[in-house]
Amino acid sequence: TIADRQAEQAMRDILTERLPEHAILGEESGMSGTNGDWLWVLDPIDGTRAFLTGRPTFGTLISLFHKGRPVLGLIDQPVTGERWIGVSERPTQFLSDRLPGTIGTRPCPNAAEAELSCTAPEIMTAAHAPRFANLQKHTRRTSWGGDCYAYGLLALGQIDVIAECTMNPWDWGALVPVVEGAGGRITDWQGQSLTLESDGTVLACGDATLLPELVRHLS
């Protein structure tokens, strides 16, 4: 959309002016710069369908990668005034003037008790759909349509598990520090850390001890 392109360009202009030595990767305009160590990854409107239909589950995602791994992430929901800020190896911050919330994932040691979330069933490819369906069978129930906002809710202890595929670095980069700084884990479906070379699958859980069981159900 025009809003996507204009928002990304505004962010690019600020970063280029203040940090000209850093590279930038955005959903709308691709890669600029060649610095191999520091890379800003931008998604001005994650959840375009939600944005276009007036549902406040979209958000702006900004992340900073260092040597291929995300070390800083921001999820911003401008309608509700909520913002999550994650920095590697530090507690996630939640900022909100209107809505209450305390950062911290909740215990959920068994998949059978877990609330599962995914943006939409149609994001599943033919190869991934049966694996996701198997995970569904082993969880309590599934909710749809959260986009990046679901990961913020996981960091607040409202959701237990999120499993998605066909994700790009601008979709998940900001989510990693936010989820991990709240006490959760976020990996690919094999349980491996997410990098720029990852396969597009994303698995997040609030209770880190649940990860091996989830990976088994998705295998």
Model-derived features with residue positions:
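N-terminal subdomain of lithium-sensitive/metallo-dependent phosphomonoesterases centered on the IMPase/IPPase/PAP
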Residues: 1-45
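Residues at secondary-structure transition points
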Residues: 2, 6, 52-55, 145
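Residue-level signal for inorganic ion chemistry
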Residues: 4, 15, 48, 77, ...
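Generic detector of well-ordered alpha-helical packing
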Residues: 5, 28, 44-47, 78, ...
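DPxDG-like acidic metal-binding loop motif
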Residues: 34-93
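Short loop segments at secondary-structure junctions
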Residues: 65-69, 79, 88-91, 97-98, ...
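An extended, acidic
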Residues: 104-219
